[in-house]
Every structure is written in C-alpha cells, then in structure tokens.
C-alpha cells in the first residue's frame, strides 16, 4: 500500500476534529451500568446504541439471545438470562462484506463501587468499560459513519453485532456470531488495543466447567466409613487438573471454586468444582478433553462418587495462521500509511474473535481504543486513541471496499460458509 489517496484522505479528514464529541459519547455510555447480569442496564444500553447506530441506515434489529443455563450450588441447572443483542445489516448483497462486532456488557455489576468516570489527565480517563469496550464501539461507529458518507460505501456491505454477554463467554450470542461470520469475508472486533498500540495476535481458547460430584452422607463420628466425601473428591479432582500445565506445556487449568459441604458432623455428599481450562491449540483442547475424562473416571473410582461434568469450550483457540496474518498485514499496512507502527503480541485472553476465527473467518479483534487495566477499577482509556483508531478503521474499511483483502483469505472465509 501507499499513502492514502486523495479520496481516502478526504474521508479521514472528516474524523480529525471529532475527538471531543467521541469522548463525550464514551463518557455518556460509561455512565450506564451494563454489567452482564444487569438486564435493565443492558436494555437501556441497547436502546442508546440503537439510536446511535440508526443513522447509518440498513436494517437494525434486536435479536433475542439463545437459551443458556448455569449450575447452581445445589448442582442443578437453571436458565441463565442474557440481554438482547443489536444487529445491523447494510447492503447484504454487496460482493465484499465485513462483520464488525462489539459488546455492550461490562464486568462491573450494578452494585460494584466502580461506576463513575474520572479524567485523570488531558489524555486519560478512568471508568467502567471506557476501554472494554464502549470506547471501541465509539471508534467503530465513527469509522462507519465516515465511510458510509463517502463514495466507498457502495463498494461493500457490512453487518454489526453488539452483543450483551461477551464478558461471560457469549453463550446467548454465539449462534448469531457464527451465522454472520459465514456470510462475510473479514471480521473486525473492537476490543481494546494495548497502551502502546499493539494488537492481540494468537489467543488461547477457554473452557468453563462445573464438575458436579455426588457422594454419600454419613455421620462424621458414628459411621464416617459409610460416607463418600464429595468435598475430598473435589479436592482430589482439583489437584489432578492442576497438573495440566506440567503435563502439557502451553495448556493452563485453574480450579477456581468449590461449592458444597455443610455441618461439621456430616460427611458431605455434594460438591461442585468450578474450573477453567485454556488451550493454546486445538490439539491442546483435544488433549484436555481426554485428560479430564480420565481424571474424572479415576477420582470417581477412588472415592466412590458420581461426577457429572457440565460446560465446555466456549472459546476455541485462535492461532495466528496464514489466513489471519493476511488481514493483520493489511491492518499493519493501513497503520503505516497513517504513521502508526502496529505490531501484535500473543495473549491468553479470549474474546468473540476466537469464535469468529473458528468459523474460518480472518479477524483482527483489537481495533478499539488504546487502554489498559481492564476488568479492574483502574481501567483507563487514552483519549487521543479515539480519533487515531477511528482513522485506522476507516482506512481499513475503504481498503477492504476496494478489494484489498488477499484472495486467499477471502476464499478461506467463503469456504467455511
């Protein structure tokens, strides 16, 4: 690629003075608590975003989440409710089609003390979701508005999905994401870039599990030998899972919580072990699935308990393969044309980009603002990155509209449909 053409430069110039308006937009959105379990807040956030995206035109709709469930402390599954998702479709018959995704939910519950936005200095704000990822949604919208008002708009179609459950692994929106991924040639997701501007490259996968362990109650003093201690079995299972990193380098397992037990004089007959497994590759994932089954069988036999495993790998591993690199190279070239040196680093974190890549779609999933300390009360966004990253996305969209995505990447995406 070369420096932006005169036509591209004219579009980019429309973004140059939008910094104050974009900052005000992010601050307003951050003031709406949209924690993943705050359905009222998510509904308000969805309505607010619908009004913001409606001027783009196209078909805008609310999409109900798929059914999901969770395992309670009693070992029983119950329905788990999620908010509705926003879906915008623009020019679906265009020969070049792009999927842009973001999430309206945050990790901060309605009763979390971290609720306000604070300006730390002229270029830094602190607030819930400012980086992850309400700032990213603002970047996405600004870029789309700029390109939509340009001659380049006729060259491509796009879909936008803003889901309500990304922070809890997208159980209600995963089918919607997969359907859309199979209709397009490239995916752009607006998770925050790193403070230095680097993007996430390869990502580990992630699986969340609940092992429901049922033993046998007995009196702890009179006849403990007749009991089958579910808590002890859960501990044994946790220790077995903790060996995964040594047995399979690159794979991590985190036994996170044990629910169960009761009075001190009763052998506990129920325990729920909750754990997370993160594989680097699909081979790691298959190894983990086999190893989990083996450990569960061994613990069950050793302790005389029944173990039922719930959950699964909701985020497949996302390797930085040749298909992904072609889109990364295009982003890097666009950045260079704007004076940005864009690199990437592998990460153990996961996002909807994992799911899109699993559909065969080339995807760059950290096109949002530069920021950091996400998932904490120190979360921050660098203000100058709003315009910087909006310009990057706008140029990327214009290049995609002109057919810049290498044929091999587009063909791979189409083959997965």
For the regions a language model picked out, list residue spans one by one.
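Metal-dependent amide/peptide-bond hydrolase catalytic core
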Residues: 1-10, 14, 34, 51-52, ...
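Acidic/His- and Gly-rich active-site-bordering loop/insert found
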Residues: 2-126, 149
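Short coil/turn connectors at secondary-structure junctions
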Residues: 83, 94-98, 114, 121-122, ...
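Short beta-strand segments
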Residues: 100-102, 161-163, 188-191, 212-214, ...
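Acidic-glycine-rich active-site phosphate/pyrophosphate-binding loop
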Residues: 105-121, 184, 202-212, 333, ...
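Glycine/charged-rich beta-loop-alpha catalytic/anionic-binding loops adjacent to active sites
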Residues: 115-130, 214-218, 374
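Acidic/histidine-rich catalytic neighborhood of metal-dependent amide-processing enzymes
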Residues: 133-204, 246, 401, 405-411, ...
